[in-house]
Amino acid sequence: MKLLNNMNKDRFIKFQSSVENTWIKRMTWNGLYNNESWVTINVAKFLKEAKPFEGTMFSNINDFWKFINKIKIDYVKWCKDIEDLDDKEVEALQKFFIGCIGEYFFVTLFKEHNTLVINNKLYRFDYVCPRLDDEKDYGVDLTGVVSNSTENKSNECALQVKFWNPFNKDFQMTYDILSRVFTDAILNDFIDKNENENIFVCWLNDDKNISKALRHSPIWDYIIFIGKKELNDNINGKFPEFWNILIENLNNI
């Protein structure tokens, strides 16, 4: 356990030493076909040039998400001025944009408000960072160390970010999605497979919108959701202050 925790700390230190370059790379669209690198189609570059957040202020997570869902259209229009895109690429780019903002949102959240009450338990998140450049992506988006004060123990943790539409019931968390995350986390030594409660899913959808197969699967006991309720309970009162920090950081990537 100590070895794995140290590994997460070392990964976080490595991330901190190249935080700007890491985010620029993660926010660069690699193309839907042939894995070509389209450096010009970059979320960070769009935010600097279009300045969609200029003059904005939100007091809760729902209003923030509605705005993100709105400006994804502006992002695609901006991309179309640079590259010719077909319908599949447009849809993929919208999801890519929301995913980038979602990952950045949660990394910033765990840096500024690293203690959250989830299911009446107090958790502290440390060393949370995105995947490093040399790590293949099979499902885990963020990693870190989580401490459960109720049980007085610290575990390495894996987090998947699904920054999904809280107002759209069509998105469902399934066994296939979470089983890939669980397998990826274990095979890459992001978590200790013998410890419970070390896979977190960060999403904004309804907690009832989960497949029956997932609820009855063996991995269900390993999963903790950080969703609308948890975010509303923990940060809504501090959201204006958090929003200023988030936007300042995004504008300086």
Sequence positions of predicted segments:
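Mixed-charge (Asp/Glu-Lys/Arg
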Residues: 1-253
